[in-house]
């Protein structure tokens, strides 16, 4: 795949060290055109189109033969809890509130920063292997998560999950954790990692604390990452307590803005959807998690689409999915919408692809999610010899409906090659460290590993 004069062995570690001027030749694009792609040492696409190689071959440090591959934008996971990879398979087939209160929250009480580091390392590895180059993360010990993300080379928006249940001292501590994270992320001096404030949900963070979160987001110009209308019980309880829907409550407290990413939205009303459109909120669809936890209703994509809401895609955490494969999530989203709302044309393949790429970039506040001049070189190369990609009548259809993570051959983020020929440096070390960390977490909780 690579020009022998540059990188002969497919596992040459020099390939992964830094971003270098790179030329990808003769690669297929989703619109079935053949193209060359040239990006510079800053990781910015300089130009793409036919016959570019003829003029720029001598300027490239690395030349990749793309003739057997399909190039697509890197996938963007707009809602997850990355370090919950350590909880994969720990608690399944339970009611949501029982799952949270009896299993997840008690185990999370034993988490340390080292657990979060290894869980996030494992998450980044899994995401890279399946073509994801950016994610929006809400969890704990996020400085340790930042260390893992920086080592992995992908993009992330990191936030400390705020849960207060009205406790003022708790809110003070949670805000301090967020402030520390924001300052820490800025000190890293990298454009790949940014921060957000994350009030968990209107049922775990009361109005007076939601207002604090909204004010801090406005002050620091950072994303608000939250859960919204995931279950009917959440909506009913909010109506009973406050006389309004969770969406209306978030709006009243200032938490609905163009910087808000609201996950789930399964039980949004039509009025809620109009409100989200007016406030230019992005909604992250998490169909696998929603179906596994039996939320009872699919996110009303048709209402959101009709109102012009930006809808993106997320996996949620591995304890409720149980993987981070965005290609699988893309297919599930399309099928879930068609089935639940009884519409064979709802959420077609092209929209599912946008949901996992360019619409996700918009939600996270950066230009990207497309392969074109001036955009970040966030590129995934899919093997056209993989059985699920044959035949290739419609590349977009294959990406949305037949592909899964194993079709991904090469992953590039901001020009840096993170996976090449399915090889990622230190993969065995990461898996061993994560396995040991998961066992340690259970031992700390007094659970037999």
UniProtKB/Swiss-Prot annotation:
Keywords: Hydrolase, Metal-binding, Zinc. It catalyses: 5'-deoxyadenosine + H2O + H(+) = 5'-deoxyinosine + NH4(+); S-adenosyl-L-homocysteine + H2O + H(+) = S-inosyl-L-homocysteine + NH4(+); S-methyl-5'-thioadenosine + H2O + H(+) = S-methyl-5'-thioinosine + NH4(+); adenosine + H2O + H(+) = inosine + NH4(+). Substrate binds at residues 108, 200, 230, 316. Zn(2+) binds at residues 79, 81, 227, 316. InterPro entries: Amidohydro-rel, Deaminase_MtaD/DadD, Metal-dep_hydrolase_composite, Metal_Hydrolase, MTA/SAH_deaminase. The keyword Metal-binding applies. Pathway: Amino-acid biosynthesis; S-adenosyl-L-methionine biosynthesis. It is an enzyme of class 3 (hydrolase). Gene3D superfamilies: Metal-dependent hydrolases, Urease, subunit C, domain 1. Binds 1 zinc ion per subunit. Transmembrane segments: none annotated. Its EC number is 3.5.4.41, 3.5.4.31, 3.5.4.4, 3.5.4.28. Its cofactor is Zn(2+). GO terms for molecular function: 5'-deoxyadenosine deaminase activity; 5'-methylthioadenosine deaminase activity; adenosine deaminase activity; metal ion binding; S-adenosylhomocysteine deaminase activity. The keyword Acetylation does not apply. GO terms for biological process: S-adenosylmethionine biosynthetic process. Disulfide bonds: none annotated. CDD domains: ATZ_TRZ_like. Homotetramer. HAMAP family: MTA_SAH_deamin (MF_01281). Catalyzes the deamination of three SAM-derived enzymatic products, namely 5'-deoxyadenosine, S-adenosyl-L-homocysteine, and 5'-methylthioadenosine, to produce the inosine analogs. Can also deaminate adenosine. The preferred substrate for this enzyme is 5'-deoxyadenosine, but all these substrates are efficiently deaminated. Likely functions in a S-adenosyl-L-methionine (SAM) recycling pathway from S-adenosyl-L-homocysteine (SAH) produced from SAM-dependent methylation reactions. Belongs to the metallo-dependent hydrolases superfamily. MTA/SAH deaminase family. SAH is a product of SAM methyltransferases and is known to be a feedback inhibitor of these enzymes. As a result of this inhibition, organisms have evolved efficient enzymes to metabolize SAH via different pathways. The pathway found in methanogens differs from the canonical pathway, it uses the deamination of S-adenosyl-L-homocysteine to form S-inosyl-L-homocysteine for the regeneration of SAM from S-adenosyl-L-homocysteine. 5'-deoxyadenosine is a radical SAM enzyme reaction product which strongly inhibits radical SAM enzymes. This is 5'-deoxyadenosine deaminase. It comes from Methanospirillum hungatei JF-1 (strain ATCC 27890 / DSM 864 / NBRC 100397 / JF-1). The lineage of its organism: Archaea, Methanobacteriati, Methanobacteriota, Stenosarchaea group, Methanomicrobia. The gene is dadD.
């Amino acid at each position: 795949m690579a020009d022998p004069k540059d990188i002969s062995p497919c596992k040459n570690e020099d390939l992964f060290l830094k971003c270098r001027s790179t030329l990808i030749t003769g690669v297929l694009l989703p619109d079935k055109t053949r193209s060359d792609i040239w990006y510079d040492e800053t990781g910015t696409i300089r130009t793409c189109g036919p016959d570019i190689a003829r003029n720029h071959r001598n300027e490239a440090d690395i030349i990749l033969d793309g003739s057997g591959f399909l190039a697509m934008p890197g996938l963007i996971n707009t809602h997850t809890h990355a370090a919950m990879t350590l909880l994969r398979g720990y608690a399944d087939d339970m009611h949501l509130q029982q799952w949270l209160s009896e299993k997840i929250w008690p185990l999370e009480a034993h988490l340390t920063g080292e657990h979060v580091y290894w869980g996030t390392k494992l998450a980044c590895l899994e995401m890279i292997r399946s073509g994801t180059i950016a994610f929006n993360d809400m969890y704990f010990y996020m400085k340790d998560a930042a260390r893992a993300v920086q080592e992995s080379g992908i993009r992330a928006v990191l936030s400390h999950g705020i849960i207060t249940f009205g406790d003022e001292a708790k809110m003070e501590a949670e805000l301090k954790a967020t402030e520390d994270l924001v300052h820490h992320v800025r000190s890293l001096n990298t454009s790949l990692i940014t921060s957000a404030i994350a009030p968990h949900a209107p049922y775990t963070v009361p109005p007076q604390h939601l207002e604090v979160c909204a004010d801090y987001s406005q002050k620091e110009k950072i994303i608000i990452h939250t859960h919204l209308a995931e279950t009917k019980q959440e909506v009913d309880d909010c109506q009973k307590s406050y006389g309004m829907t969770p969406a209306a409550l978030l709006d009243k407290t200032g938490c609905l803005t163009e910087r808000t990413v609201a996950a789930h939205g399964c039980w949004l009303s039509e009025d809620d959807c109009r409100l989200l459109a007016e406030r230019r909120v992005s909604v992250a669809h998490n169909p696998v998690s929603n179906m596994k936890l039996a939320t009872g209703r699919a996110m009303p994509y048709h209402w959101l689409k009709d109102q012009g809401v930006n809808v993106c895609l997320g996996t949620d955490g591995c304890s409720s999915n149980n993987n981070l494969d965005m290609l699988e999530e893309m297919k599930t989203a399309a099928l879930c919408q068609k089935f639940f709302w009884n519409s064979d044309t709802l959420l077609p393949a092209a929209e599912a692809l946008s949901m996992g790429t360019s619409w996700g970039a918009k939600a996270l506040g950066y230009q990207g999610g497309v392969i074109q001049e001036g955009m970040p070189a966030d590129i995934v190369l899919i093997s056209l010899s993989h059985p699920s990609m044959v035949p290739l009548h419609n590349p977009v259809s294959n990406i949305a409906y037949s592909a899964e993570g194993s079709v991904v051959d090469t992953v590039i983020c901001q020009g840096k090659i993170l996976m090449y020929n399915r090889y990622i440096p230190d993969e065995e070390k990461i898996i061993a460290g994560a396995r040991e960390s998961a066992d340690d977490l259970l031992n700390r909780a007094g659970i037999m590993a």
